[in-house]
From Swiss-Prot:
The gene is xpt. It comes from the Bacteria. GO terms for cellular component: cytoplasm. Belongs to the purine/pyrimidine phosphoribosyltransferase family. Xpt subfamily. This is Xanthine phosphoribosyltransferase. It comes from Bacillus licheniformis (strain ATCC 14580 / DSM 13 / JCM 2505 / CCUG 7422 / NBRC 12200 / NCIMB 9375 / NCTC 10341 / NRRL NRS-1264 / Gibson 46). 5-phospho-alpha-D-ribose 1-diphosphate binds at residues 128-132. GO terms for molecular function: xanthine phosphoribosyltransferase activity. Homodimer. Converts the preformed base xanthine, a product of nucleic acid breakdown, to xanthosine 5'-monophosphate (XMP), so it can be reused for RNA or DNA synthesis.
C-alpha cells in the first residue's frame, strides 16, 4: 500500500535494527484518513472470506481494526491486556509476549463476543515474532470460531512472525513489508536487490 509506505518513509523513525517508531500516525497519534485507507484495503483483501467479526489487541490495533470493521460491516472485538471490573468471568485468555515492550501479558476476550459460527479476521498494527497474533488465534480457537486471515499494517519481514503464522495454515496479508531497518533506514521488501 503506497500511501502507507510513504507515511512510514516520511514520518517513521528507526530506533534500532529491530524497532520502528510510528507514533505520529499509528500507535500514539492516529491519522484517521490513513486508517480509513488501511481499513478499505483490508476490506478489499478479505471481503470474499465471509468475515463476521474482527479481533485485535489493545491498543494500537484498534484504529485499523475499527476502520476495517466499518468497511466490512462487522463488529470489532479487542483483547484486553489489563483486568477490568466488567471483564471478570467467562473469559477466553492467552499469554502473549510483546517484542517491543519485552514483557509477557495475559490478554482476554469475553466468550460472549465470539461464537463457534464466527469467521474471524485478526488485525494488528505490527507483525514481528507473531506472538500477539498467535495469542489471538488461540482465543478464537477456544471459542470454536474460525480464523479466516490476519491483516497486518506493518510487517517486519526480517523476523519470524509471518513464517510462524503461515505454518499454522493461516493467510497473512501485510500492507507494508519491511525487509530491513539496518543503518537507520527503512527498506521495504520489494526494494531488496533493486
Amino acid at each position: 500500500m503506497e500511501k502507507l509506505k510513504r507515511k512510514i518513509a516520511e514520518q517513521g523513525t528507526v530506533l534500532s535494527d529491530e524497532v520502528l517508531k510510528v507514533d505520529s500516525f499509528l500507535n500514539h497519534q492516529i491519522d484517521p484518513e490513513l486508517m480509513l485507507a488501511v481499513g478499505e484495503e483490508f476490506a478489499s483483501l478479505f471481503r470474499e472470506e465471509g468475515v463476521t467479526k474482527i479481533v485485535t489487541i489493545e491498543s494500537s490495533g484498534i484504529a485499523p481494526a475499527v476502520m476495517a470493521g466499518l468497511k466490512l460491516g462487522v463488529p470489532v472485538v479487542f483483547a484486553r491486556k489489563r483486568q477490568s471490573l466488567t471483564l471478570t468471568e467467562n473469559l477466553l485468555t492467552a499469554s502473549v509476549y510483546s517484542f517491543t515492550k519485552k514483557t509477557e501479558s495475559t490478554v482476554a476476550v469475553s466468550a460472549s463476543h465470539l461464537s463457534k459460527d464466527d469467521k474471524v479476521l485478526i488485525i494488528d498494527d505490527f507483525l514481528a515474532n507473531g506472538q500477539a497474533a498467535k495469542g489471538l488465534v488461540s482465543i478464537i480457537e477456544q471459542a470454536g470460531a474460525k480464523v479466516c486471515g490476519i491483516g497486518i499494517v506493518i510487517e517486519k519481514s526480517f523476523q519470524t512472525g509471518r513464517e510462524e503464522l503461515e505454518n499454522l495454515g493461516i493467510r497473512v496479508e501485510s500492507l507494508a513489508r519491511i525487509a530491513s531497518l539496518a543503518g537507520g533506514k527503512v527498506t521495504f521488501l520489494q526494494e531488496v536487490g533493486s
